[in-house]
Amino acid sequence: MPYLRHALAGAPFRRSDGQVVVLMSVFMTVLLGACGLVLDVGSWYRADRATQATADAAALAGAQSLIDGTAPAEALAGEYADKNGGGDLTVSFGQRVLENDLITVTVARTEPAFFTKLFGIETVQVNSRATARAGVPSRARYVAPITVNEQHPMLQCECFNDPTQVALINLHNPGGGDAAGAFGLLNLQSLSNPSGNIGADLLGQWIRDGYQDALPLGLYDSAPSANFNSDYIRNALRDRIGEELLFPVYRTITGSGSGAEYDIIGWVGFVPTSFTTGSSTGTIRGYFTKVVWQGLADETGTVPDFGVRVITLVE
């Protein structure tokens, strides 16, 4: 009987040990599954971020070609998508201000599952979308202080890349009192910091480097005190031969001399190829060009379009 009592007394503990083993097995299975899910979800999250980066790059690249049409924009978007990991690409176009000024790129990739295959999940579809806009700038950075009249023949026909010239001349009309002493150069800081006449050294710096702040459209003072044959201006122009510059486009001039004001209505890209300068005249030869520039895009649809675009990611 003592032996029987000892045997009966030990039986519950043997059953408890078995339950613990079963519970531990279930717990370990759940734990491994949870760890596997965490690892797979982390992998899918990284894939989603990579896919979003691809969509962003493709949309921004495509937007740079929107000014040339939707076909070049779609082709460039596809090219950049392939360079950044590829995927199934869908491209569409829309309008915010100008026709087809928006490009939307959707990138889809199939990502494999690893641990979650135990639960029947073989693959996961990762989709990312980005929209970029190519807008006409209402504000522009890195502007050069050389003006172009909106009636320039090459701006009337949008003859980009055709040889032409910008004349830097005394814009005074005899008997008209129209900006006597104004030679087509602007005091770009006159809106924020009026300071009267400025020197050729500062004008040369703006030609070489562009004005650093984002300039709005509006009335700008003339800069009549600098000679075109100054070494500052000549050296700056020489440094920019063959490079894109951004010129302000004006509609009207009022006043005279240092009091003359140019009504700046837009911006245009120009590539100088050569120049001549004198004390009171000058000519910059080159061609107008479509450019992508830094600035803020117009939201009103009222800024004239001279072939300059500001690219922004809007979604």
Regions found by a protein language model. Give the residues of each.
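N-terminal leader/signal peptides at the extreme start of proteins
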Residues: M1-D17, V22
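Flexible, membrane-facing loop/turn or short amphipathic-helix motifs
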Residues: F114-E122
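Alpha-helical hydrophobic helix detector
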Residues: V22-L39, A53
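N-linked glycosylation sequons
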Residues: A71-E74, G94-L102, E122-E315
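Residue-level signature of catalytic and energy-coupling elements of molecular machines
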Residues: G18, A81, V105, A130, ...
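Short amphipathic secondary-structure patches
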Residues: P2, G42-Y45, R49, A57-F114, ...
